[in-house]
Amino acid sequence: MENVCGWIAQAGSAPQGARLSSAQKADWLVIGAGITGLSAAHTLAALHPQARIIVVDRQRAAQGASARNSGFVVAHEHPAHSELIGEPGFAGFEVDTAISRAASDEVRQRIARHAIDCDFRDSGYYFAVNDRAKLDHVDAKLATLRALGARAEFLQGAALAQKLGTRHYQAAIWCGQGNALLQPAKYVKGLLNALPGSITLYEDTDISGLERLSHGRLRANSVDGSIEAKQVLVCLNAFVPRVGIADTATFPMELSASLTRPLTEQEFQAIGAVEPWGVLSTRPLGATVRLTPDRRVMIRNTAEYRTRDLSNGELTLRRQHHVRGLQRRFPFLGESDIQYTWTGHLSASRSGQAYFDRVEEGVFAVAGCNGSGVARGTLWGRLLAELASGIDSPLLQSVMHRAEPGWLPPRPLFDIGAMLRMRVEAVRARTEI
């Protein structure tokens, strides 16, 4: 089957950018034209209006992982037991929430500044479960979320079904005041289209490595060209190692999702003509589900650590998993109702924290979105550009202080451990797919 992202297909085509085919020089080079890289490029252009800035991507700009995620703008995450008020992890959770709220605000500011039409809905979303046991300590979670500025409500049974149009979910915490939904491909395409004319973009340009030249500048090499720059920002998240930065303590995960055709008017009325919504599971491998403004259902219920990308045949099997998840929620939907199925990647870490650092003189990198790439990627791009420009702030200090992704064992031990952990989590989440 064909791997086609429904978000990208709906965002519409864009003119093909040039491919690097010569030696170029720049003041700034940004590697990666996703949310983080484009946010960084916008910030650099504002801070250094006379500088020459080049952005490169190994594929079409704004069509990588940033366009393929589920479109959740995360300001408030579901707190673990150790992060509740009165528990040892609350102080760290409080700092992380302040960062996430700033990131959510950054998304809103970008959308307003560049007039990006991306189906943005500032309506919150749900942490919902089929198995009531997987949503515990409800009162403490509500108190924790509210103490950190969220609006949070507990729903169950008929009241929840009335909101979602399905009786699959038995209990949920709705969380707003910063949490939002958008169409990710439209958002990142909007960032791309708003780049100032002073920025040069090269697409389909795979940077294979960085080398330090004798006079201190850096050269990024591709098959048919090179770019010499004073400063380099590496915004590749899961794929930072491709340019030779190996020690980020982060790792890639491959996810798959499907998007249905729009519901018919009869189907829409049958589920109660509900407002668009988004659901995140309380389990790491539980399903992420959305009902979009154009009445489609999106489901993402596979996440894997792999040493190679899924083949089309393997994606067909994942699509069957999507079908089972759809039919648990909306029995009238089957495989023939799926219009798009695709894969995407995220960058994860053992601790859930990012890698955000000055790698060496003139080289700055970020990785480890841990599933919150829309908001955090937007903020990280700005802060990475500010760090590289010598601009400090309390927010930047908070991000750098929390940027401890944790130690990973060497391969192949890590490969074995990660795959076993994924299997265990899949079993734990079996009621939530």
PLM features per residue range, with description:
Residues 1-28, 46-47, 51-52:
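Extreme N-terminal leader/targeting segments of oxidoreductases
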Residues 2-10, 79-85, 109-190:
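Flavin (FAD/FMN) cofactor-binding and adjacent substrate-gating region
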Residues 32-36, 58:
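Glycine-rich Rossmann-fold phosphate-binding loop(s) that bind the pyrophosphate
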Residues 45-68:
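Glycine-rich FAD pyrophosphate-binding loop
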Residues 64, 68-99:
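Glycine-rich active-site loop/strand segments that organize a redox cofactor
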Residues 113-121, 207-209, 215-216, 226-266, ...:
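Active-site substrate-recognition segment that forms the wall
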Residues 136, 143-144, 171-230:
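Helical element adjacent to the flavin cofactor pocket in flavoenzyme catalytic cores
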Residues 305-426, 430:
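C-terminal catalytic lobe of FAD-dependent flavoproteins
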